[in-house]
């Protein structure tokens, strides 16, 4: 049984897959978004204990999300190859939503670090404590020029750095690692489905090319078979005419037998056996009409 025969039609797995794409994973993503809002709020207010607790809860949501994506992946791997295109359209929206949510969560911290570094290098604003990768966005900064002109004032919300002696600093690093792993899982899952579809497309192209080659090859083999069949009586007649008599007849028939053996790949096993039987009958007749000619049986005995 081939690998594809062990798989099933998409319609059999569609209800289970849609449960993940429309209910389970969107629910996890909504919960993750709420954690992100709370994390930003607690860090801005410097409520470190609450922030630490929210990091832990968000990490649990990320782990649950990873688990659900893996379960959905197992279902998708059971879908037959000819349904992969439809499957891809079914899972792409939730996959993109998960990827965007993870990137947004991580980008929040990245933009904070980059902005504060820029402010530090320009020496135009108040410097926050030393930066680490475990930072998010919060307080408001104003440049001197912005304060002079309220119409052109821009606000950059940068969250304060989490003190290294707070548990929230360590819990954020753990959450950050979980988010990166989740992002990689979503990417790998997407690549898996896409690679399977590309493999199917490649196989179809090769099958179409092979079909054309087989058709052309069949035509050529047919022509070759006709030419060989037409040549057999001619070659047999020429040799038989030169030798003459019963021996000449045998020689001519032998040429036909050799040609048939060489052309067995074209004529097939059945055709070869048919010629062989005819040859045997002819030799038996010749042996009976020519007593001096040894038979095949006598040759074997000798």
Curated annotation (Swiss-Prot):
UniProt-annotated stretches for the region Necessary and sufficient for localization to autophagosome: 229-275
Lumenal topological segments: 250-254
Main location: endoplasmic reticulum
Transmembrane segments: 229-249, 255-275
Modification sites for N-acetylserine: 2
Cytoplasmic side: 2-228, 276-302
InterPro entries: SNARE (IPR010989), STX17_SNARE (IPR028676), Syntaxin (IPR045242), Syntaxin/epimorphin_CS (IPR006012), T_SNARE_dom (IPR000727)
Keywords: Acetylation, Autophagy, Coiled coil, Cytoplasm, Cytoplasmic vesicle, Endoplasmic reticulum, ER-Golgi transport, Lysosome, Membrane, Mitochondrion, Phosphoprotein, Transmembrane, Transmembrane helix, Transport
Entry GO terms, CC: autolysosome membrane; autophagosome; autophagosome membrane; COPII-coated ER to Golgi transport vesicle; cytosol; endomembrane system; endoplasmic reticulum membrane; endoplasmic reticulum-Golgi intermediate compartment
Post-translational modification: Phosphorylated at Tyr-157 probably by ABL1. Dephosphorylation by PTPN2; regulates exit from the endoplasmic reticulum.
Motif extent (Endoplasmic reticulum retention signal): 299-302
Annotated GO biological process: autophagosome maturation; autophagosome membrane docking; autophagosome-lysosome fusion; endoplasmic reticulum to Golgi vesicle-mediated transport; endoplasmic reticulum-Golgi intermediate compartment organization; exocytosis; Golgi organization; intracellular protein transport
GO molecular function: protein phosphatase binding; SNAP receptor activity; SNARE binding
Bilayer topology: Multi-pass membrane protein
PROSITE patterns found in the cross-reference section: SYNTAXIN (PS00914), T_SNARE (PS50192)
Coiled coil: 53-123
Domain t-SNARE coiled-coil homology: 162-224
Complex and partners: Forms a SNARE complex composed of VAMP8, SNAP29 and STX17 involved in fusion of autophagosome with lysosome. May interact with VTI1B. Probably interacts with BET1, SCFD1 and SEC22B. Interacts with PTPN2 and ABL1; involved in STX17 phosphorylation. Interacts with COPB1. Interacts with TMED9 and TMED10; the interaction is direct. Interacts with VAMP7. Interacts with RUBCNL/PACER; promoting targeting of RUBCNL/PACER to autophagosome. Interacts with VAMP8, SNAP29, VPS39 and VPS41; these interactions are increased in the absence of TMEM39A.
Chain's role: SNAREs, soluble N-ethylmaleimide-sensitive factor-attachment protein receptors, are essential proteins for fusion of cellular membranes. SNAREs localized on opposing membranes assemble to form a trans-SNARE complex, an extended, parallel four alpha-helical bundle that drives membrane fusion. STX17 is a SNARE of the autophagosome involved in autophagy through the direct control of autophagosome membrane fusion with the lysosome membrane.
Protein name: Syntaxin-17
Species of origin: Bos taurus (Bovine)
Lineage start: Eukaryota, Metazoa, Chordata, Craniata, Vertebrata
